[in-house]
Amino acid sequence: MPKTPANVKPMDVLKSALSRNVLIDVKGNREYSGILEGYDVYMNIVLQNASEIINGENKGVYDRVLVRGDNVIFVSPSKGDGS
């Protein structure tokens, strides 16, 4: 039986996004876009080749970024990610 939104768990979504481009929206009008390298049960997230976007403006690219889980608002596949 295919999974419907009612029975999809957040950690399953993160697991399926490993090694793919994701967009993370965090508190303070910030976003990070990069390759999901890892995460834990607290939603701490590690991205590779991450772009930091503040108020819609790209502020820089970093080799590796750790986003603290209590700042995460949502995580979604990046636009144009064909994986």
Swiss-Prot record:
CDD domains: archaeal_Sm1 (cd01731). It holds the Pfam family LSM. One of its GO terms (molecular function) is RNA binding. GO terms for biological process: mRNA splicing, via spliceosome. Keywords: Ribonucleoprotein. Residues 9-81 form the Sm domain. InterPro entries: Lsm6/sSmF (IPR016487), LSM_dom_sf (IPR010920), Sm (IPR047575), Sm_dom_euk/arc (IPR001163), snRNP_Sm-like_arc (IPR022901). One of its GO terms (cellular component) is ribonucleoprotein complex. It comes from the Archaea. HAMAP family: Lsm_RuxX. NCBIfam families: PRK00737.1. Belongs to the snRNP Sm proteins family. This is Putative snRNP Sm-like protein. It comes from Thermoplasma acidophilum (strain ATCC 25905 / DSM 1728 / JCM 9062 / NBRC 15155 / AMRC-C165).
